[in-house]
Amino acid sequence: MSSIRLADLAQQLNAQLHGDGDIVITSIAPMHSANGEQITFLSDSRYRERLGECQAAAVVLQASDLPYCNIPALVVANPYLAYAYMAQIMDTTPIPAQDIHSSAVISPQATLGKNVAVGANAVIESGVVLGDNVVIGAGCFIGKNTRIGAGSRLWANVSVYHNVEMGEQCLIQSGAVIGSDGFGYANDRGKWVKIPQLGSVIIGDRVEIGACTTIDRGALDNTIIGNGVIIDNQCQIAHNVIIGDNTAVAGGVIMAGSLKIGCYCMIGGASVINGHMEICDKVTVTGMSMVMRPITEPGVYSSGIPAQPNKVWRKTAALVMNINEMNKRLKSMESKLEDENE
């Protein structure tokens, strides 16, 4: 949608309108740059003083911030959530494909639902089942016997290997690879012997997978991504990982094989998580953490050393390098004190 009346937007957001509802909104913008045709939002009351300088046509805010506002406003309980829905309403992103392109290679043994679109040079192999309103972008590869649920969209150059199952309303960004071989090898006197990965990948409904993320197929059982999971760009999900419903994974995360993560977790960017263990529900792992042991209690977990001035970091590193020697000296001193007190 390219434009909308403020009153109509208020109705769709279930917001209270204050001011002229006939104003036409053309787009959304940050508060500092919004102009007289754009709407903005205030999600943090600490910045309410910016309302006095705001040049937007209207603003979305909480009721407690309304007295500080001198332009038309939409009052909601959660402005940031309203912003998300507002962005969906006004989204002008083109879909990955409009129809079935003449250069697409589609097996006669594939089954396509109603209103399926397939972009240029995409390959759909035999046994594939695409649900209604599925969109496959240009250059995608969909391997044998894979099933993709209704309403799912794949942007250009996504590779989905054989026997993968993907639910409804999923969104897969360009360059993602789903169902590639897990890293499975046996050692025969120094020679690596490949173990064919005989499992697959099962993806639930409403899952989003970022650009250039890889999800390996299981060795014997399946790699499983639960409903509502969101995975950012350039993540590595190894074979037999299980991610519970509505967990969020930020960019650059590496998950080793056979890891099980619960529901409603949040994994910060560039974190590394060991395999063959379990993380319970409702765990937050902050960015760049290294998780080596199971987590059995909900909460926030962190590791690593935040950036410091180089001189400070060098001193800290020197202390860490010498900590064993310092510990020996401390124990020696304690022993001497005990002897003196006897």
Curated annotation (Swiss-Prot):
InterPro entries: Hexapep (IPR001451), Hexapep_transf_CS (IPR018357), LpxD (IPR007691), Trimer_LpxA-like_sf (IPR011004), UDP_GlcNAc_AcTrfase_non-rep (IPR020573)
Catalytic activity: a UDP-3-O-[(3R)-3-hydroxyacyl]-alpha-D-glucosamine + a (3R)-hydroxyacyl-[ACP] = a UDP-2-N,3-O-bis[(3R)-3-hydroxyacyl]-alpha-D-glucosamine + holo-[ACP] + H(+); UDP-3-O-[(3R)-3-hydroxytetradecanoyl]-alpha-D-glucosamine + (3R)-hydroxytetradecanoyl-[ACP] = UDP-2-N,3-O-bis[(3R)-3-hydroxytetradecanoyl]-alpha-D-glucosamine + holo-[ACP] + H(+)
Gene that this polypeptide is encoded by: lpxD
Annotated EC: 2.3.1.191
EC main group: transferase
Assembly, per entry: Homotrimer.
Family, per entry: Belongs to the transferase hexapeptide repeat family. LpxD subfamily.
Record-level Gene Ontology MF annotations: N-acyltransferase activity; UDP-3-O-(R-3-hydroxymyristoyl)-glucosamine N-acyltransferase activity
Described function: Catalyzes the N-acylation of UDP-3-O-(hydroxytetradecanoyl)glucosamine using 3-hydroxytetradecanoyl-ACP as the acyl donor. Is involved in the biosynthesis of lipid A, a phosphorylated glycolipid that anchors the lipopolysaccharide to the outer membrane of the cell.
Active site: 239 (proton acceptor)
Protein name: UDP-3-O-(3-hydroxymyristoyl)glucosamine N-acyltransferase
Pfam families: Hexapep (PF00132), LpxD (PF04613)
Keywords: Acyltransferase, Lipid A biosynthesis, Lipid biosynthesis, Lipid metabolism, Repeat, Transferase
